[in-house]
């Protein structure tokens, strides 16, 4: 009953009421402390997301409070960083994003971090991507971020090397699509471009925000299917159509190209 009441508040967007109810449940030992803190972080993030446009400073405070309760909550970090970027405070945005990245590298953090300043050159963005790689080396998200930024900067050898390294860690649709983009930009060889596109079709899909069998482009605090709080996870969608990447190993795929 307590859970149903909490979820009802959430479905109606009554975040403050939900937080008060959660605090009461925690005080009465209805809910375990660790779970209560995680759920409160989710509620604070939901509240922050709704007021980012109208009250960016208030949204930032809620998001930072959420991060104290759940230090790897990517959506909270994104909201806090966006609030700082509205004030052109790149340094403070970085201080929010970098610890979360080190703990849980996420492509949405990489995208915001690398493209934080609209006036940056492609080389500036590449340097920022390389900063992320230095914080989390030998990681698929770090390598992908550098590969993408290197392609934009027309540093094709670096782009190709980083994309291949990412593919060796975990072959994914997006990596093979990036390989196709690199091929198109560097050589224009349509045969090779088609080869990488074919690999992308066979590769596992990239992780996404998934809950109760649905995929969302963005994180949501509550499942639209069941009303469950904190339902969304960042993972590969279920039921994906995939086949083995041609030649079974990425080494063979790279060699064949």
Protein language model regions, located:
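TPR alpha-solenoid repeat register
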Residues: 1, 35-36, 76, 109-110, ...
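Alpha-helical positions within canonical tetratricopeptide repeat
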Residues: 17, 58, 75, 91-92, ...
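Hydrophobic/aromatic side-chain positions at a characteristic register within alpha-helices
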Residues: 10, 51-52, 68, 84-85, ...
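Alpha-helical adaptor scaffolds
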Residues: 39-52, 95-168
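Flexible helix-coil transition and linker loops at the boundaries of alpha-helical arrays
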Residues: 28-37, 132
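Inward-facing hydrophobic residues that define packing positions of alpha-helical scaffold repeats
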Residues: 21-23, 63, 80, 97, ...
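C-terminal non-catalytic interaction modules
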Residues: 172-257
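TPR/TPR-like (Sel1-like) alpha-helical repeat modules
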Residues: 7-28, 88-108, 167-173, 184-208
């Amino acid at each position: 009953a307590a859970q149903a009441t909490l979820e009802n508040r959430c479905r109606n967007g009554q975040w403050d009421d939900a937080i008060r109810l959660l605090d009461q449940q925690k005080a009465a030992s209805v809910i375990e402390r660790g779970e209560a803190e995680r759920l409160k972080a989710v509620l604070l993030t939901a509240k922050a997301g709704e007021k980012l446009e109208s009250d960016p400073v208030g949204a930032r405070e809620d998001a930072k409070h959420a991060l104290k309760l759940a230090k790897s909550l990517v959506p909270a970090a994104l909201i806090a960083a966006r609030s700082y970027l509205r004030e052109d405070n790149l340094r403070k945005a970085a201080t929010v994003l970098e610890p979360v990245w080190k703990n849980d590298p996420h492509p949405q953090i990489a995208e915001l971090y690398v493209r934080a300043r609209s006036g940056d050159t492609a080389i500036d963005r590449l340097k920022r991507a390389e900063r992320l790689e230095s914080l989390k080396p030998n990681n698929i998200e770090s390598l992908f971020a550098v590969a993408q930024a290197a392609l934009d900067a027309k540093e094709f050898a670096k782009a190709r090397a980083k994309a291949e390294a990412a593919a060796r860690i975990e072959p994914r649709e997006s990596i093979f699509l990036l390989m196709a983009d690199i091929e198109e930009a560097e050589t224009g060889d349509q045969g090779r471009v088609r080869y990488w596109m074919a690999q992308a079709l066979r590769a596992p899909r990239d992780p996404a925000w998934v809950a109760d069998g649905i995929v969302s482009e963005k994180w949501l605090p509550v499942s639209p299917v069941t009303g469950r709080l904190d339902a969304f996870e960042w993972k590969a969608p279920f039921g994906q159509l995939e086949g083995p990447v041609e030649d079974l190993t990425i080494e063979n795929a790279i060699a064949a190209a």
